[in-house]
Amino acid sequence: LVENSSDLDFGRRFCNILEQVHRQTGKCCVVLVDEYDKPLLDVMDSGLRMKDGNGNEVLIEDHNRGILKGFYSAFKAADAHLRFVLLTGVTKFSQVSVFSGFNQPKDISMDDNYEAICGISKAELLENLMQPVGELAEIYDVDTDKMVELLEEQYDGYHFSSGMTDMFNPFSLLNAFDKRRLDSFWFSTGTPTYLIRLLQHNHENLNDLTGRYYRPADFVDYKADAENPLAMIYQSGYLTIKGFNRRFNTFLLDFPNKEVKEGFVSLVANNYLQVSRDTAVEAMEWVQTIEAGNLSLLRKQLTAFFASIPYTMRRKENERERERYFHYTFYLIFRLMSTYTILTEKRQSEGRADCIIETPAAVFIFEFKLDGTADEALRQIEEKGYARPYAADKRPVRKIGVVFSSQTGTIEEWKEA
């Protein structure tokens, strides 16, 4: 189609192809590009370098950006030969000029008109997929209504605009039907390398990201930056819209479903704590122990878990680092456990308990202290009235004070009242 193609850059070569196809067929072209930003994400903030055509050393990220800019500029030059162009990717890269040559692209990321363009809605599930739902229900020995509820809990919960239409992850949902089991299919496909690098920059800030309202500019229009992880985490599908405040035009962001929450928190915990065993598996065992009411076993399990964390991670040099490690470690542990049981955050006028876990048989109130005493922790539970909301509850309320040593990095004292 193109003569002397070796002498043309990518953009011009692509433009010539579009022109020739139009001329030979008499029809304008439709161009679909998936993961348009992958060449940038793969090397973003990696610091990797290469030699350019002139022998100069440049960042691979900058080199790839230049190639993409030239390639995508072809769409403007070939406008007369195009019927429709659709690009999908994780990021907009609005401030890195990849699309500076584009002819007014339309961003439909949060457009109500297109909020259901990806995924499977509950209405579509009920109308078209009840046969595989019924087959799964039979395997799990539940009725179809319960099976739909389980599928929603595991794979539903995505929202892409203020319209708040619930969407299932189609990859996970269809794999569940095909494999005839509920599992973490999307997360098992592998974690992008750019996300791993991002998490290494932002460990202690992740507990502040979820369950909060943000302006659209905070997570949609941004410059890809490892120091600002929110937008990348949201646009990668690990967070989604869970609420909309029309008055202030702000969006509540949180995990979409159980699959993503379990996978993401486990990824963060494994990456941060550097333990050899999967923390999600550990969390399942802890939940089973709590549900059995065996607190002595839970203490042994948690003590062993902390001991498995490399000493260099547990032993921080300054007080601020020790305090931050202590709080973030317990945050990760109980955030993982909340995937499998009820973890409540009931705030009193005097404050909020470190952790309250509800099971069908009992309520467990935990208070943690760094280099304090278990009696101090138990006294705080009483003085702050953390058990007050359960005064009329028929379940027994068990109060546990736990002391974490900054010197050893493990549990030093454990006492129940």
Residue ranges and their predicted role:
Residues 20-25, 336-360:
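Active-site metal-binding core of divalent-cation-utilizing nuclease and nuclease-like domains
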Residues 70-78, 231-239, 328-336, 380-400:
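Metal-dependent nuclease catalytic cores in nucleic-acid-processing enzymes
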Residues 389, 393-417:
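Domain-level recognition of nuclease-like catalytic cores that cleave nucleotide substrates
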Residues 30, 362-364, 398:
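Structural motif
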Residues 330, 353-370, 384:
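Conserved catalytic cores of phosphodiester-cleaving nucleases, focusing on short active-site segments
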Residues 39-41, 94-100, 374-377, 407-413:
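Switch/connector loops and helix/strand junctions flanking conserved nucleotide-binding motifs
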